[in-house]
Design a protein with these regions (language model features):
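N-terminal Rossmann-like NAD(P)+-binding domain of SDR-like oxidoreductases, especially those catalyzing
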Residues: 1-186
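C-terminal substrate-binding subdomain of Rossmann-fold SDR/epimerase-dehydratase oxidoreductases
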Residues: 35-38, 207-332
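Solvent-exposed, non-membrane alpha-helical residues enriched in polar/charged side chains
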Residues: 75, 79, 117, 170, ...
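Active-site loop immediately N-terminal to the catalytic Tyr-X3-Lys motif
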Residues: 102, 192-196
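A glycine/serine/threonine-rich, flexible loop-to-helix segment
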Residues: 144, 195-202, 270
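The catalytic Tyr-centered alpha-helix of NAD(P)H-dependent dehydrogenases
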Residues: 154-161, 196-200, 224-228
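Hydrophobic alpha-helix immediately C-terminal to the catalytic Tyr-X-X-X-Lys motif of short-chain
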Residues: 164, 168, 172, 203, ...
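Radical SAM [4Fe-4S] cluster-binding motif and immediate context
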Residues: 189
Length: 332
């Protein structure tokens, strides 16, 4: 694993906007930006309890309240705060929630993206814009791993919403020369994720409490997992590369550790990190999900020089320890 650090001279005093800053990836990315000295403005829709990650940066950012679908608010935000770099992360990010409420998902993920794109089109100060797509946008493919030349063949509601967001971003670059690039990542994990419905947080909490981990699928689904710090650094690396080579606008990049795991394999690795040996409760109730999906990060390695900095085993051990401390603090 290699070590890469962002260029503080590039980020210092740079006007940056982050949508979705209070989300899991967004909170880590915003923490990095604040530490680098960027002038960060965040778009916030709802009041959510701060995590230990977001609590550290909340006093140091400018907050604009509004929905990401509100183009007028975005135009005011980009203009008033003279945004040069925009990270568009705001989305409804839960597959199960998307299946239960597709309309709200389409409004947030599709209408939200076209509002960001149109506001960016009308905001000539913006030099780099990054849209968060997903490995889910590829849909079920006959050959794996996914690479960036594969068509976006999403079918299920969440997957379609991310594919549409991806294509909208490409369209605004091709048609209007909006300087946008696209990230396609797998499942983020690491410190600060308190969504217990997700497999890593839920499993960590169960193991620490001595309870059987619960798997809602049959455990054989293959997925891509990326530590959130490596994910945040991927976004920073992409923007710095876009600054050095504006020709990267319009490109999509996969970011991955290239270590695909079944859900059962992931749980076994978490048990090894936690020092437990509990039999998982396999529910087999997951539906409308793709059996196997994982990414090739070859393009990101070759074009951007990006590589993950944390091995999978170290990342899982780091994550277990964070939850152990967090849950101990909650019990006091």
């Amino acid at each position: 694993m290699t070590t890469w650090t962002p260029d503080p001279d590039f980020w210092r005093d740079r006007p940056v906007t982050v949508t979705g800053a209070t989300g899991f990836l967004g909170s880590h990315l915003t923490a990095e930006l604040v530490a680098l000295g960027a002038m960060v403005t965040v778009l916030v829709r709802d009041d959510v309890p701060p995590t230990s990650i977001s609590a550290a940066w909340l006093p140091h950012v400018r907050k604009v309240r509004g929905a990401v679908e509100d183009q007028a608010i975005l135009e005011r935000l980009f203009g008033e705060y003279e945004s040069k770099t925009v990270f568009h992360l705001a989305a409804q990010s839960q597959v199960g929630a998307a299946n239960r409420n597709p309309v709200a998902t389409y409004e947030a993920n599709i209408a939200g993206t076209w509002a960001v794109m149109e506001a960016a089109r009308r905001s000539p100060r913006i030099e780099q814009l990054v849209t968060a797509s997903s490995d889910k946008a590829y849909g079920a493919q006959p050959v794996l791993p996914y690479d960036e030349d594969m068509p976006l063949a999403a079918v299920n509601p969440y997957d379609v919403s991310k594919a549409c967001s991806d294509l909208l971003s490409q369209s605004y670059h091709q048609t209007y020369d909006v300087p946008v690039s696209i990230t396609r990542c797998g499942n983020f994990f690491g410190p600060g994720d308190l969504n217990w419905e997700r497999i890593v947080p839920g499993t960590c909490r169960s193991l620490i409490r001595g309870e059987a981990p619960v798997i809602r699928s049959d455990g054989t689904m293959v997925r891509d997992y990326l530590h959130v710090v490596d994910g945040a650094n991927a976004y920073l690396r992409l923007v710095e590369s876009m600054h050095d080579d504006p020709g990267l606008a319009g490109e999509a990049f996969n970011f991955s550790t290239e270590t695909p795991l079944t859900v059962l394999e992931l749980v076994d690795r978490l048990q090894a990190a936690a020092g437990t040996d509990l039999e998982a409760e396999v529910l087999g109730t997951a539906s409308h999900e793709i059996d196997s999906q994982y990414l090739s990060a070859e393009k990101a390695r070759k074009v951007l020089g990006w590589e993950p900095t944390i091995s999978m085993d170290d990342a899982l051990a780091n994550t277990i320890e964070w939850y152990r401390t967090h849950l101990a603090d909650d019990d006091r």
